[in-house]
């Protein structure tokens, strides 16, 4: 079993659940989505990642947070062990995506998230994206004020560079960074972000670790298939096990909209790959010539 990860001062299961797929186009019915969340929690997952804008469009904003809140209230297990991580700083004008990290928007977004989630304090609130109109120091400074007011417990940032992370840290304590990281997306590894996070004790939350639309490439990759057959696991589980072995700072949050996928992802924490297998994956990772949709 891979060691737990530390986030916001709490030890959590090394794999979280990305809840976005349960609120966008093609989403499951609410009852099924709640079953997915409960299945993940029942198999040890303790970090649920959401955001106010995980929705089909502008009129649907808040769908995912509302869903997560309902799932938690219906959960018969220990809700105190669950770390809910949400985000603010993005809007959905006309169904598109835009950045708004102005302090006044972040305050409104945080307060709306609290109401939708039905909790008194958000365990981890993340700046969803950097807004070119506002310095990251100003955005994070507002999150620090919200933390001091007791509305959130800890601050994270998302979709940032190493330089932006350092600027954010000058404004407040940053406990996590959430960036895209997976078999086909190695920038946090190649660009030094993962090393900085490991050195500074910051959790690197790997979103889209299974590639999103690139998941088909993972499923059909010859190396990942071969390693998976050897261990009796799927290529997707191979990738998650590789990420966990890559750095103790990395906490993948694979998305799921089906119960079986949520359970399989959580189970990857129990997989140990051999050193030669890890080396082979490392050598192959990032090679888009094998990508197929």
Which stretches of residues belong to each language-model region?
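N-terminal binding-site loop/beta-alpha segment at the start of enzyme catalytic domains
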Residues: 1-81, 211
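Acidic (Asp/Glu)-rich catalytic clusters
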Residues: 9-11, 42, 70-83, 114-118, ...
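A structural motif
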Residues: 12, 45, 119-122, 152, ...
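A short acidic, helix-capping loop that chelates divalent metal ions and anchors anionic groups
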Residues: 24, 54-58, 91-97, 215, ...
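Active-site groove signature of glycoside hydrolases
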Residues: 114-132
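Beta/alpha (TIM)-barrel catalytic core signal, keyed to glycine-rich beta->alpha loops juxtaposed to Asp/Glu
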Residues: 130-293
